[in-house]
Each structure stands twice: as C-alpha cells, then as structure tokens.
C-alpha cells in the first residue's frame, strides 16, 4: 500500500436487499469518513458514501450506484482510502499521522542499537502496534504505547523502542511452584 493512501474505513456486511452496507469508520467521528472528499479502494475505484443511518450507507462506485444485495456482498471487506494530501496538516510538531511512522528507523532506548525499520502500523481496535522489520528478515511487533515507544522523532527519522520484558513462563509440566502438574516435560 502506498504511503500516499490513508485507510479511513472498511465496508462491512450488506443490509437488506437494496444495496445498503454497514460501514466501519476508523475516524474519531464517523461522519469524517466523507469529509475529506472521494474515497478510493485498493483498485483505485472512486467510492462515494451516502449515509442513511448510523453506520449504514448507500454506495456509489465510479458513478454507478450499488442497488442490490449481491453487488453489496461483493464489497464486503473493501478498504476505504483517501489521498494523504486531503488530510489537514498536523498543527504541532509532536503530532503525526500513524502512516508517518512507516519507514522510520527503530532503535533501542538503552543504547540506540538499530533494531530495524518500521514496516507497518497495525490497529485492530485494541491499540496500535508497530511491525518492525529486522535485517535478517524477521519481524518484531511492538505495542505502540508511550512505555514501549517513548520517543517518536519524525524529523530525525526514528523511533526509540523500550521493548516489553517477557515474563518467565513455568517449565512445561511444572506449575509456578515447581510442582508436577501432570504434563509431560519436553
């Protein structure tokens, strides 16, 4: 996906037989989904929403209205994007859009050792996480919290990471007190 496209929402399941669909908005105010102009899908088609009720919309694709349930079903999980330049500029140097993090270097807080590069920002509703691609090709997921990512420096092109410490899990076959729990030790 291009950094010039910003994901604002997704088309959900159809509603009724006349082409209406449920729409999930990733904006703070769902009405903002249409405030920035025409939306696009990943194929580049222009999508216009006509809100009918809370989270329910009629859809027009490239000027053609969706008028039946079958056509609406084919749109399920279609992601809705806008062009980056349609967003207002950030007002404060400490503000940024999550897409601005993609491509930044990820370094450790302790000694600024290079961990890798932010490849993607994931947000599934419970909080964002950064996918960091390491030089060996393996990825690392870090929760995007102030504790785990205390420094975001867009101008310097980096984020500083303080990875969460992993808890010591009990040895398989033993509980926390060291007693045999009936499992087989590997």
Curated annotation (Swiss-Prot):
A GO molecular-function term, please?
Answer: ribosome binding
Source taxon at top rank? Bacteria
Keyword Repeat tagged? no
What InterPro entries does UniProt report for this protein, alphabetically? PRC_barrel-like_sf, PRC_RimM, RimM, RimM_N, RimM_N_sf, Transl_B-barrel_sf
Its annotated compartments are: Cytoplasm
Pfam families cross-referenced by the UniProt entry: PRC_RimM, RimM
Task: Return the Basic and acidic residues bias intervals.
Answer: 173-186
Is Zinc-finger among the key words of this record? no
Record-annotated PRC barrel domain positions: 93-168
Keywords in alphabetical order: Chaperone, Cytoplasm, Ribosome biogenesis, rRNA processing
For this record, the Gene Ontology CC terms, alphabetical, are: cytoplasm; ribosome
Q: Where is this region: Disordered?
A: 163-186
Q: Which GO terms describe its biological process?
A: ribosomal small subunit biogenesis; rRNA processing
- What's its job? An accessory protein needed during the final step in the assembly of 30S ribosomal subunit, possibly for assembly of the head region. Essential for efficient processing of 16S rRNA. May be needed both before and after RbfA during the maturation of 16S rRNA. It has affinity for free ribosomal 30S subunits but not for 70S ribosomes.
Domain characteristics, as noted in the entry? The PRC barrel domain binds ribosomal protein uS19.
Per the record, the similarity remark reads:
Belongs to the RimM family.
- Record note on quaternary structure: Binds ribosomal protein uS19.
Q: What is this protein called?
A: Ribosome maturation factor RimM
The organism named in the record is Granulibacter bethesdensis (strain ATCC BAA-1260 / CGDNIH1)
Q: Which gene encodes it?
A: rimM
